[in-house]
């Protein structure tokens, strides 16, 4: 049976080594996020200040996998 995961949105607050990031969720929780393989393969750059979707396990709510970088409203791309 596949593990159930929660999907949250958050803001990247700090960049850490090896594709890890400190993410502040919309509910004000601060968790550790790592880049999913699909984002890593696509060479998508994630910087502090970016909004992301993050998938969090029910069993360990202190870590999550970054699955999507949301587009900023003020950028031209």
UniProtKB/Swiss-Prot annotation:
Similarity comment text for this entry: Belongs to the IF-1 family.
Record domain S1-like: where: 1-71
PANTHER family named in the record: TRANSLATION INITIATION FACTOR IF-1, CHLOROPLASTIC (PTHR33370:SF1)
Subcellular location, record wording: Plastid, Chloroplast
One GO cellular component, as annotated: chloroplast
Name under which the protein is recorded: Translation initiation factor IF-1, chloroplastic
Quaternary structure and partners: Component of the 30S ribosomal translation pre-initiation complex which assembles on the 30S ribosome in the order IF-2 and IF-3, IF-1 and N-formylmethionyl-tRNA(fMet); mRNA recruitment can occur at any time during PIC assembly.
GO MF term set: ribosome binding; rRNA binding; translation initiation factor activity
CDD domains given in the database record: S1_IF1
Keywords: Chloroplast, Initiation factor, Plastid, Protein biosynthesis, RNA-binding, rRNA-binding
Function: One of the essential components for the initiation of protein synthesis. Stabilizes the binding of IF-2 and IF-3 on the 30S subunit to which N-formylmethionyl-tRNA(fMet) subsequently binds. Helps modulate mRNA selection, yielding the 30S pre-initiation complex (PIC). Upon addition of the 50S ribosomal subunit IF-1, IF-2 and IF-3 are released leaving the mature 70S translation initiation complex.
Organism: Cercidiphyllum japonicum
Transmembrane feature ranges: none
